Amino acid sequence: MKLIWKYLMKYKKWFLLDFISVFGFALVELGIPTIISDMIDYGIETQDTTYLYSRFGIMAFISVIGVSGVVLLGYCCSKISTNITRDIRNDVFEHAQAFSAAEMEKFGVSSMITRTNNDAYQIMLFLNVILKSALLTPVMMCVSVMLILKISLELSYVVLATIPVVILGVIIVAKVSEPLSENQQKSIDHINQILRENITGIRVIRSFNKQEYEKKRFSNENDFYRDQSAKLFKLMSCTEPSFFFLMNIATVIVYYLSCTLLNSNAVTLGNVVAFVEYLFHVMMSVLIFCMVFMMYPRANVSAKRIMEVLDTKPSIVNDENSIQLDSIQTLSFKDVTFSYPNGEEAVLKNIDFSCHKGQKIAVIGSTGSGKSTLVKLMNRFYDVSRGSIEINGVDIRKYDLESLRSQIGYVAQKAHMFKGSIQSNICFGKPEASVEEMVHAATVAQASDFISTREHGYEDEIAEDGTNISGGQKQRLSIARVILKKPSLYIYDDSFSALDFKTDAILRKALKPEVKNAIFFVVAQRISTIMDSDMIIVLDEGQIIGMGTHVQLLKDCSVYQEIAHSQLTQKELDDYERN
């Protein structure tokens, strides 16, 4: 397995120590049957107590070395396996951080969680076993077979005939178990997906009375996982008894043949005892080998799933000669067309406009017109399919991604909160911010009032995904987070939708001095939110069908007129024109 070998090479010293401890333990264990054989032949049968006492001392010394070897072996194995699992999880997480939205959609959140946790854990279990047995098993088996051949060639035929039967059985079991293991891991993905959907969408499920449907969906997937696991466990549970049955038959045959050999003085009683001990070591080595071989399919499936993530190259990457972006003075869309990965039709078509520092730009249009998609392209969450987006006259693909995003403050349509304090959420983009800066940002975002009513104020805890605060409070905290960052380009993607009209108006007024030296980009549904914009872009089916000020669009754009008249009275529109 390339994945395991790649990470194993990082711990060469520990692996070498593991190697040494394996050899030490194996040689000690394999020496004991020979000593017992000599004790029987030269001590017990001759009643030489002095010889027996001397061999007892040697056995005690060897046993201490053997125990020390086992302890050292266990420590090395746990050290290597846990560290490698940690490294795999870190690498998967770090690699996923560079994924664009397209790669994240390809794998899915639930599958990524399963790969990072469950699949990495399966590899740890496999590593822990293989590091103990991969070196120990061949040494024990090879040396035991050599000693068996040395003791009696006739008896060794029993062992040599048994081993191929066991190995053949293991190969068959491994082939049968691999597809079952793969189905298991995929089923865990689906179970996690259903769980996640039910936890995050519990209100929708209840409002549509779909609890029974969701229970059945989860139960069906859970039953499938149970069935696959049961088949796997049954397969494994049959393998071990079969092995011991075969081992017992071999032992009985050895004892039967030994009677004839003892009568002809071909072997001694000590030889027979040692032979049976070595036979046990051979069989146990084969058993351990079987266990590793049976664990391999599941670990291999997990390794493939992890490699699938690590081998996926992010589609959004830095240019080889990327440049730093210090501030944004101008922003231009030049004949931009965009289609989502695997999408049949373009979501945006021939988008063309320019704006500069100090301007407020608004985007409005019907649902599905491409408003949110347009602003996502500015952050390079996706790259354009055709055309270019330029900042300060340079294609944004030429800029270093980190420096580009450091100049953009983006408030998503759905506000996201992290588990932690209100302070940590506001300061997420600027952890070093002073208390005064944080309070100012919260005040501008109209969040300070509700924060002051909380028991611990800014230190009050927010639950995972902000489940203990309202939608409007989430939006205000998200807005405060961006205000504190002080970017060159503010992007508010329908971020005022959960606010009442009064709070919306106060917030927009408070925002003006904050954004006067930046480009202020707003996606909105409300005409009242964007009436004072320097330029309003009207989108319909991914195309610009109108562009200008509020007054200009009321005269020239029929779609804008429809939206305006559906939200405002003629008197309100006339009053705005007069002012």
What do these predicted ranges mean?
Residues 25, 29, 33, 61, ...:
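Alpha-helical transmembrane segments
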Residues 325-579:
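ABC-type nucleotide-binding domain
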